[in-house]
Each structure stands twice: as C-alpha cells, then as structure tokens.
C-alpha cells in the first residue's frame, strides 16, 4: 500500500537531539524509531529492532507502546511484534516480510519503510560514525548488547553506497553530523 505521508526514520546516532525529535513530532509525518528511539520520541508510528537481546532488555518498557513493532530475529511468539525475515545482506527486498539487512538496523529500517509503502524517507540520527567518543545519543548500550566499533561503521557504509533505491522513492538525510553521504542532505527546517 502506497503511503502519501513522509516517514522520518530515527536512528541512534550521537548527533540526534531532543529538539530535532520534538520538531519532527509536530509535523504531519509517520515516525519509525530504531531501537532506543522510543526513549526520545513519544509519537512513534513504528518501532524496529533487529536483535532479540535488545527486545529482551527493553521489553517491559516497550511492550505497551501503541506503535506497531517489528523485529528480524525470532521473538519467541511475543505478542505484538511482527517477525520479518532475513533475505540477505545487500540490495533491497520488495517482498513482504523479507528484509535485506546491510548488517545494521538503520539499513533494515529503510527497507522496512519501503516495504510499508513510503515514498519519501527522511533519515535522522544516521551518523554512521563515532562523535566525541560516543556511539549513540544516549551513550552506550548495556554490556550485553552491541556497541559498534568505528571499523564496523565503515564496512556498513558500503551497503548504503550500493543500495538500489527505486526511482519513485526519495531518501533525504537530515542527520546533523553524518558519514553517510550517498543520500541528499537537508536540514529538517528545509523539509517542513
């Protein structure tokens, strides 16, 4: 189903600010939060997290959120989390419920938004780099969860560079500080 609204995808990069999120929340857009985005955004339309370990750690805080939830790893039948399927690393999937992974949740969220029918995707918090020693806007994940080292970000960028974005889909990177240069960049204030 094609969506007429734009969707803002909120990742966890260290340049993400509460002010940017509050600005987005006032716009007529849908919002797809990745992982801990629920902690900074109170108006999620969707929540996506790949890893079962993340869901286990956060379940008591996210289980009652009114947004639609998606995961890539098996969720052991958790009610309210739709299970997506891993369809490989590179490219994009156009078959529901399969996702190409790009080996990171940000890439998977883009594929999910396209599968959901969105034609205008706005990226926020897609730093794809460390910033002043930080990996995420909230600091590090707990030790039992993943915190990507810098070399991993560099490897992930290659998947984005070769992402075959359909001609009728527009992806704009509104991230304040980013190493992701394959999509046009614009500040939020120029988009709304």
Give the ranges of each region predicted by the language model.
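Metal-ion/cofactor- or nucleotide/acyl-coenzyme-handling active-site neighborhoods
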Residues: 1-192
């Amino acid at each position: 189903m094609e969506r007429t609204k734009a969707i803002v995808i909120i990742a966890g990069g260290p340049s993400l600010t509460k002010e940017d999120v509050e600005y987005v929340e006032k716009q007529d857009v849908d919002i797809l939060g990745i992982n801990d985005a629920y902690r900074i955004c109170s108006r999620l339309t969707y929540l996506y997290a790949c890893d079962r370990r993340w869901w286990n750690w956060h379940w008591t805080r996210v289980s009652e959120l009114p947004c639609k939830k998606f995961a890539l790893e098996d969720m052991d039948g958790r009610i309210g989390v739709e299970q997506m399927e891993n369809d490989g690393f590179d490219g994009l999937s156009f078959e529901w419920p399969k996702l190409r992974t790009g080996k990171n949740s940000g890439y998977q969220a883009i594929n999910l938004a396209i599968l959901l029918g969105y034609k205008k995707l706005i990226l926020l918090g897609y730093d794809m780099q460390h910033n002043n020693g930080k990996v995420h806007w909230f600091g590090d994940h707990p030790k039992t969860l993943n915190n990507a080292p810098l070399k991993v970000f560099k490897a992930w960028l290659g998947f984005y560079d070769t992402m075959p974005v359909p001609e009728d889909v527009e992806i704009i990177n509104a991230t304040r500080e980013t190493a992701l240069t394959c999509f046009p960049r614009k500040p939020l204030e120029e988009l709304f």
